[in-house]
Amino acid sequence: MTDQNRKELLHKTGELYKQFIENQDEQRAAKLAAVMKKAADEEVYIAFTGHYSAGKSSLLNCLLMENILPTSPIPTSANLVVIRNGEKRVRLHTTDGACAELEGTYQKDKVQQYCKDGEQIESVEIFDRYTEIDSGVAYIDTPGIDSTDDAHFLSAASILHQADALFYVVHYNHVHAEENVKFLRSIKESIPNVYFIVNQIDRHDETETKFGDYQAQVEEMLCNEGISREALYFTSVTEPDHPFNQMGALREELSRIEQQSKSNMQALTEQKVRNLLKEHTEMLKKDETGAPSFAEQLNIHTGLVQSLRDQLDEAEKQMTEAEKRMQEEINRILKNANLTPFEMRELAAAFLESQEPSFKTGFFFSKAKTAQERDKRRNAFFSDVAKRTEAEADWHMIDTLHKLAKVFDVYTAESEKLIQAYRTPLDISIIEHAVKHGAAFSSEYVLQYTKDLAELIRKEAKREAADIIKVLSAMVKERVSKDVQTINDRLVQESEKLVFLQEQARLENNAREKTDRLWAIWEEESACPMHIDTEWFKSKKTRVAAPEQKQGRSQLTAQPMPKSEIKMEQEMPLQDQIKRFYTLSDILGECSMLLKQTSAFRERVKRLEERKFTLALFGGFSSGKSSFANALVGERVLPSSPTPTTATINKITKPINGNLNKTANVVFKTEDDLTAEILQLTGIPKEPAGRSFTEKWEKAVKKNRLQEEHVKLISNFLLAYEKYQQYIQEQKKLTIPLSELKPYVAEETTACAVKEVTVYYTCPLTEKGITIVDTPGASSMNKRHTELAFQYIKDADAFFYMTYYQHSFSKGDRSFLRKLGLVKESLSMDKMFFIINAADLAKDKTELETVTDYVSAELVKEGVYEPQLFTVSSKEELVGKPESFYNQFSKVRKHLDRFIEVDVKKASAAQLSSEADKLCETVFQLHQSQHQSREEKEAQKQCLMLSFERTAADIEKRRNSKTIIEKVKKDTREQLYHIAQRLSYFANDLLKSAFHPGLQNGDWKKNVSKAMTTALHEYLFEYIQEIKTLDVRMSGFIERHINEEWLDHFQKTLNEDGYFSVYAGDQHSNGIQLKEVEPEIEERAFEQELKEIKSPKQFFEQKGKATFIEAVRMKLTKITEAWIKNEEESLISHYTAHLRRLQEDMGEKAIAQITDQKETYLRGYAEGEHAKEIEMAYQACISWKNSDNTIKM
């Protein structure tokens, strides 16, 4: 860079810096100053970033051959640490903008504490005469990019835009984490040199996986992302002599970078300034939030306020005009009603003629005949009048009143009943009242008569309708007055918001003017004043003394873990209790009158004794789930590896149904399953045509322009299909010895076709009836893994969530754990256990406590309160090493045993204990009745029957209760609302992440289309997971209600009554079936939004990205609302139907049980028939009750 170029650049950036400060964007002003300082000093920045706890700090210490930086398994570098060659000193930049300097000799441990203090210290610069760094070079250590602390992440991001080379460091066990690929895609285009370091390869176990195979997998992944194998290094700090350690080669590459030419410094600096300017102008326009402009919002909101005012006017008008409108409609109908048509006049004339005094008829004009004829004509005429009134008036009146009730929104069961009952009140006298006596009979008189009669009918109709109109008008006024209040309240709120938006729109316009001015400064020489100080970028920070360091080993706000400290001496002898239940059933089984009850009791005891339990393992891939499962059973049953192994659901259970120990049954997917999975993973819109599965997908590979990874994926499916076609088509199980298991669960070329593997293995754990389910990784790049795992959240009796000691609680865990947090509160008991695996890596107890405190605090952040947290070493447990301070495997086993034997079984055991007591109480009452008089027995019978009637009525009331149904409806609607809110936030974050600058690399339009497809698939997947979470929550809610209603409240009522008992059973096995949800979303729905993306420049440097994200987010929100609206009633119906089934089932069981008990009492009250049996049962119950039969909890 020439002096003249440097001077011009410094003038422009100096003016920009001034504008940034005036616009209160100190953050980007500082970045701009840092960029120009680096350019002026002609310094090379080499940054180290990657996963937190991947060993970045340890690696830097090793490269510098000195213990400079603090190291820990949890995030330690809470700020930026810059290491330079120079006179020995430390410079601290505080978060409040000051600067402190420690010159000369300093304490390393004190400096390391400053490196951990992210609250007070923003960055630390360390200078010394390091032989491993050239002058003009800075090594930069950053917090982990996947740290759960947003401040850590921002700290890392703030320096990366300045780096000349970036070394991305990952832990050996977490190479395939999805965030690796996402980060590399987002950063590789903005930094000249990107490298990938796989650290801690000392964790490699050659007996599990050959290192060459592992290396090939890593190289393939990087190659897919455009990073060459020359940029890949494998390192180990703890084992320098490790055969695969490339620390020496890494040092050589660092030396080469340090000596690289600085000829492209100006171009890189200008690009960095331009990026900062773009960010600043977006900040001015508030585009970072993706919100629409305030001018647009103002326009929309002005219309909204006017609409509310119109609604208010209309409502008030409706209140005053409802009755008038109804009356007008009724008058219109009656006016138009042809009540006395021409056809009627002949009957009218005949009737009028008969009313003449001179009217006579019959032989010799007898009076009887004349009266008979008059009645005949009167009745005929009135019948016709009544029919025509009904047809011409009543029916139309009813229809109109119905329509009016709907128009005015008062169509209720009450109003509908009132309207439907409307009839014009007609009496036969009405036709006589219209007669004008004395008038001469003529055709003109007949016409006038019919007109008068019609008017009388209309008056009657109006009078009858007036009562209905009065009721409807009152209903309208009541409803509208509520609407008016609601509209008024909203109008006040929206009017206030309108004032706010008017002010914001004004500010937004100012921001637009500022933006134009800033770009003019950068692009037009004449727009930049030339009196700017060329050393403006030099630090103007206030010099202060080094801040006081905070005391204590940790600033984490960990929650206490009381559940992990439960004393084991409280363990319950449940097996002894079960034996005692059997003893009681044997004793009472000899009493014929109690045979039905004791048989049912014995069957329930047997179900409790033989109950099966499911223990599910969750966690991110490579968290050690398979190793933990192996440690639980005591042998390497499942394969384990540093790359994701569990691509299927794997179960370990005791041998049953003739299956041999140490064998496995493999269940394959169907052709439809395979097709659906390929479509989902590749994004191919529809199933290709073809005569066979193989033909279809071979054609698809040739016809579609697929990405290389998708071609490989389909190839894997085709290989697996070809090899196991018979098993797939015929759905036959494949039985194999354990020695042949690995390909079916760990190699995608086979495992992709496997649905489930059941391993039969005899050990103490499986003999207790426990089945271990090892699920796919919760944060694996393969979405199929997590989708398969989710169903076990609901079904498992208990589950363990695994996290890795040196990489605990990464961002990949967050979404899954947040759903566990949502589910946890709905469970009737806490069945979640959290495991920190590989705790043998702990240096000492202090470090271990730091990690457990950190994990506990992070779990609490995600809604998992009071987590049951343990640290283990599956590796050491498997080889039989004695338990140490870090390996709590024996405690895990004890807690698991207690949970299964006490927490899970205690509800059933308590019910059985209560039922046993009630059986004894029945015997005691029957025994007492044997010594009562006939009168006393009769009185006892009457009390029994009254109690039976009360209890049966109570059961019916509970069975038909609507209260819980309304609660279910309310809770479902409320949860769906929150799901929509969460998905809106998720969409915003997802789209910002999906549409990154890396898309400019290659075919822009193709990359954008792919990004959209991927984002839509992820959004769809998140929606489905949210609905599944809702299913689990509602299942727990319903189960808890049934338990409270039938086990607690009803049982208490029965105990107070004294005659009857009801065994409700275990509701967990009756859980709700997860609802299948298959919403559809297509990329073509967003064609218009994609068309608006003109070019990378327009998208990233102008307002394109923010506008696009907001447009897509809003459309996704509407689509989601439509999904939810479509699902809402279906879900409510699904849940309420399940609840009604449970209530009905409970009611039937209860009625049957109390009926049996009533019959037993009645037989016992019979004179002397069962006296001997009752006496024997009585003595046996006395003996049983006197022994200790209490369940110890």
Swiss-Prot record:
Residues 141-144 are annotated as: G3 motif D1. It is a peripheral membrane protein. Its cofactor is Mg(2+). GO terms for biological process: cell septum assembly; regulation of cell shape. Residues 619-626 are annotated as: G1 motif D2. Requires Mg(2+) for membrane fusion. It is found in: Cell membrane. Keywords: Cell cycle, Cell division, Cell membrane, Cell shape, GTP-binding, Hydrolase, Lipid-binding, Membrane, Nucleotide-binding, Repeat. It holds the Pfam family Dynamin_N. It comes from the Bacteria. GO terms for molecular function: GTP binding; GTPase activity; lipid binding. Gene3D superfamilies: P-loop containing nucleotide triphosphate hydrolases (3.40.50.300). It catalyses: GTP + H2O = GDP + phosphate + H(+). Residues 1-609 are annotated as: D1, associates with and fuses membranes, tethers lipsomes. The keyword Cell membrane applies. Signal peptide: none annotated. Residues 76-78 are annotated as: G2 motif D1. Belongs to the TRAFAC class dynamin-like GTPase superfamily. Dynamin/Fzo/YdjA family. Strain PSB025 / 25152 does not have the SP-beta prophage. Has 2 similar domains, D1 (approximately residues 1-600) and D2 (approximately residues 601-1193). D1 is able to bind membranes, tether liposomes and cause membrane fusion in the absence of D2; both regions are required for GTPase activity. Possibly the fusion of 2 dynamin-like genes. D1 alone promotes membrane tethering but requires D2 for stable tethering and content mixing. Mediates lipid mixing of vesicles and full mixing of their contents in the absence and presence of GTP. Tethers and mixes small vesicles better than larger ones, indicating a curvature preference. GTP slows down DynA-mediated lipid fusion, perhaps controlling its activity. Prefers phospholipid composition close to the B.subtilis membrane; requires phosphatidylglycerol for fusion has no activity on pure phosphatidylethanolamine vesicles. Regulates membrane lipid diffusion. Required to prevent membrane damage when exposed to low levels of membrane-damaging antibiotics or to bacteriophage. Has intrinsic affinity for membranes and membrane distortion capability; causes tubulation and membrane distortion when expressed in a Drosophila cell line. This is Dynamin-like protein A. It comes from Bacillus subtilis (strain 168).
